[in-house]
Amino acid sequence: MHPQQLVISWFSLVLLASSLMTIWELEKDVYVVELDWHPDAPGEMVVLTCHTPEEDDITWTSAQSSEVLGSGKTLTIQVKEFGDAGQYTCHKGGKVLSRSLLLIHKKEDGIWSTDILKEQKESKNKIFLKCEAKNYSGRFTCWWLTAISTDLKFSVKSSRGFSDPQGVTCGAVTLSAERVRVDNRDYKKYTVECQEGSACPSAEESLPIEVVVDAIHKLKYENYTSSFFIRDIIKPDPPTNLQLKPLKNSRHVEVSWEYPDTWSTPHSYFSLTFCVQAQGKNNREKKDRLCVDKTSAKVVCHKDAKIRVQARDRYYSSSWSDWASVSCS
């Protein structure tokens, strides 16, 4: 092939790939248009097709305007801003034949917009989704925050691996009754529970789980991704059945506890380590903290104080559980 022909062919391929990537189907009759978001951007040319065997007397309208926008089985529009998005409908003789909804995914300075969810500032990386697992069963919960109250829709998909995805099923997204306050502003918390179908608790993980949240606010589309191994998101439930046993002729007591009911078994294989801490009046913490691998410890327990215990995977530095506590009095 002549070099000039090769360059022309390559350029044509790039144009084709670009046009394929800038509009794609999110779900049936819902399309996402990817736009460079700056004043001089030309926008994207979108061709809508009326899904009908009819050929003649077809007209088009949109939710933004009751005027007839065009006629024929296809409608070509230029999408540059949110006013160009929305629902487009084709009709014949007053009868609706099909509808197409256009959403916009903004890219500013090469970065996709993240306006819908609240960034959770708990690490050097930008985190919008947080996921936790109580054990190694393959079941985990993810959540996110938003200040938006209306015209909001979420959907979640998940898999382990990319080239050969394994089945991870996620349930319906639910709005939590919990309200989270950050920087003097209230945020709504949404959660979803997922389960890996073929999880083997004792197997070594070689491929990460990926969770993708599709978020829609009015006509704006965004997606958020979290990738992790189950071992990295483990956070046990707090220890249970805390009890104090006074020791004769001593200021010390023996505090005992049990593994949380939700933790993986057998405990001889899925072992936890525990930290014990005395906490004084008004929740004033003492700096000393005793960490043990067994389910009891001897500590000083002053009147009006309390003893609290937390747990973590013994062999992997994942998250500590929340505290469980028992009163000294």
Swiss-Prot record:
Subcellular location: Secreted
Predominant location category: secreted
One record GO biological process: interleukin-12-mediated signaling pathway
GO molecular function: cytokine activity; cytokine receptor activity; interleukin-12 alpha subunit binding; interleukin-12 receptor binding
InterPro entries cross-referenced by the UniProt entry: FN3_dom, FN3_sf, Hematopoietin_rcpt_L_F3_CS, Ig-like_dom, Ig-like_dom_sf, Ig-like_fold, Ig_sub2, IL-12
Swiss-Prot/TrEMBL keywords: Cytokine, Disulfide bond, Glycoprotein, Immunoglobulin domain, Secreted, Signal
Occurrences of domain Fibronectin type-III (ranges): 238-329
TM ranges: none
GO CC term, one of those recorded: interleukin-12 complex
Cleaved signal peptide residues: 1-22
Entries under SMART domains matching the protein: IGc2
Pfam families cross-referenced by the UniProt entry: IL12p40_C
Cysteines paired by S-S bonds: 50-90
Domain of life: Eukaryota
Annotated ranges, domain Ig-like C2-type: 29-106
Residues bearing carbohydrate: 135, 223
Oligomer and partners: Heterodimer with IL12A; disulfide-linked. The heterodimer is known as interleukin IL-12. Heterodimer with IL23A; disulfide-linked. The heterodimer is known as interleukin IL-23. Also secreted as a monomer. Interacts with NBR1; this interaction promotes IL-12 secretion.
Function field: Cytokine that can act as a growth factor for activated T and NK cells, enhance the lytic activity of NK/lymphokine-activated killer cells, and stimulate the production of IFN-gamma by resting PBMC.
Family: Belongs to the IL-12B family.
Protein name: Interleukin-12 subunit beta
Organism: Canis lupus familiaris
Top-level taxonomy: Eukaryota, Metazoa, Chordata, Craniata, Vertebrata
Name of the encoding gene: IL12B
